[in-house]
Amino acid sequence: METNVVLAVLFWGCLLLGMPEGRGQEAEWRKGTYSDGTLRYEGYFRAGKPAGEMKRYYPDGKLQARMVYRGDTVEAVLYSRKSDCSMRGKYVVRNKQGTWEYFKNDCLLMKEEYRDQVLNGKTVRFFSTGNPAEEKDWVNGKPEGEWKLY
């Protein structure tokens, strides 16, 4: 009897962990298409809203964005049409939040800090070698302090 209870608990735990956000609510896998039938997006939805991983595609079929939805937070990786990573960061209630990184050909170009969609913190631009090219601090969207050029 104890073995059956343990197996049942493990089984249900695995099922819940396998669901997006692990809340036990039913999630539906959906795909959307452009008017020509090309895949536009694919991902899980719960109560009509994205939940868990979602991918968006350009009309030519290349990956445009990979996002992971958790409540009001979205971790996003956005790609250029060339399919190299262009930017990576987090949205909270549709506002940029925290560190955002910008790339070109897999080379880090810049890091910025956001609070509620507004620059707050340090912005660092990089040379193609990876060394800092410039640094600037921001408070509520306005530059503050020294602007360091290297």
Residue ranges and their predicted role:
Residues 18-150:
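Glycine/tyrosine- and acidic-biased, solvent-exposed loop/turn segments at the edges of beta-strands
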